[in-house]
Amino acid sequence: MARVRKITTMAELQAALQAAFNAINRDFYGGELEKVIITVKEGKRKGAFGWIEVAKNWKQNGKDRHEINISADYIGERSVEETIITLMHEMVHLYNMQHEIKDTTRAGIYHNKNFKRTAEAHGLDVEQLSGIGWSR
């Protein structure tokens, strides 16, 4: 069994999340998703495990980039698997933004059937949850 090394710095955490993004993009999206900046910071919304910024707020090598954030409020409380599921969830939003597919309503809270279709087509199982729609 592979040995798992403990992550001890924010830089290591961000590098691990970026490596996960790259692997998921390759394996589930055929490398189609544009590069993003992954951040870890305190919650934008209470109860949100992560989010993607609609605006491209970052510049990297002269290119504008979206930001995917994993909420620092839950790091250490949630498993690695749950954190990767959050990353995959935000990647669904990225795919839909790139393809101009509206996947939420109610100020981005409710995840509609477009979100469900894209999620399931790219390896993320979702269920209908009260108040937020199709999510995980």
Language model features: what each stretch is:
Residues 2-78, 98-136:
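Metalloprotease/metallohydrolase-associated module, dominated by Zn2+-dependent proteases
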Residues 82:
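Glycine-rich, basic loop-to-helix element that forms the pyrophosphate-binding segment
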Residues 85-98:
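Active-site recognition of the HExxH zinc-binding catalytic motif
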